[in-house]
């Protein structure tokens, strides 16, 4: 049994929305901040703690404009009814934003700068497009290839470098959908998804509790017919082997072990180590490899010690390349066991906390003790978190 020290950072709870399609999806009439506020309220309702104890609300969001602008982290706290005494901030590490929110809160707890944090992330890619308002510096091309801004082309590069075939990618994508739909029908997402009101295709109000991007009817024959999405001449990456544009939010309740004990709350896991790392922007999908190597070293562990793993799965070529580099190709039965972003969607600022919440639930369902959540990040970064159930 793990003995916790007072300043250990523990995860008390974690929730998420279902993931909606960006194009005419179920959240097309729901704002990003409203969706997030629903999750914050759910954490307060599910756990017996005084929200006046919250030090800060830390929210990950990539495109911080329109409804996601003006410090959405603070707006979410106010919308959710969290006392005004709690702070609110918004962080941006592109796809790793909400995992960075977790790391920021953890570092503050470790250094005595607060005991209770609500962290999370959101991206409504239907309302705020990924490139909305972006004005890149022309001089950037002196330092990295312009194609590095095109995520699909970076996946093509990784696939070529690691000899990942089209057939392997199609099989990987199909398996993601199969696992995600099995997890859905077997109720394995029930503990993490908070129902949020949205609209069906006809515009009728509905409670959204099922990830909309999953294709339960996907077949290998369908996938093989698709043309390359990013390199029409010699490419292997298709829409079916890329994570879908989607809308969603995620949230976690983080405390010091001492505070959780004082409140009589049972922690579900503690954070063992955290890391970020950079890599060449042209192969940004490789980022989880150096980030994970750092996190493992800080935890005094090896990749063989990881019993359950969540990898963001931006593209099949990217995921397979990372698995190859981390010597996990033959251990895919412990990676994304409930499906990954190819099936579930990848709302940018939401994804880091989402995969950590999904990891925790998967560990509880599989009765494993040590887990790794890791992600690639645009322009060449990776971020990793190792957690241990307590």
Swiss-Prot record:
| InterPro entries xref list | FadA, Thiolase, Thiolase-like, Thiolase-like_sf_Thiolase, Thiolase_acyl_enz_int_AS, Thiolase_AS, Thiolase_C, Thiolase_CS
Instruction: Supply one GO CC term from the record.
Output: cytoplasm
* Keyword flag Cytoplasm: yes
Q: In which pathway does it act?
A: Lipid metabolism; fatty acid beta-oxidation
**Source organism superkingdom:** Bacteria
Q: Which reactions are catalysed by this chain? A: an acyl-CoA + acetyl-CoA = a 3-oxoacyl-CoA + CoA
Catalytic center residues: 95, 346, 376
Q: What is its main location?
A: cytoplasm
Single Gene Ontology BP annotation: fatty acid beta-oxidation
Molecular function via GO: acetyl-CoA C-acyltransferase activity
| Classification via SUPFAM superfamilies | Thiolase-like
Q: What does this protein do?
A: Catalyzes the final step of fatty acid oxidation in which acetyl-CoA is released and the CoA ester of a fatty acid two carbons shorter is formed.
Name the protein family: Belongs to the thiolase-like superfamily. Thiolase family.
User: What is the designated name of this protein?
Assistant: 3-ketoacyl-CoA thiolase
Question: Taxonomically, what lineage is the organism?
Answer: Bacteria, Pseudomonadati, Pseudomonadota, Gammaproteobacteria, Moraxellales
**Its gene?**
fadA
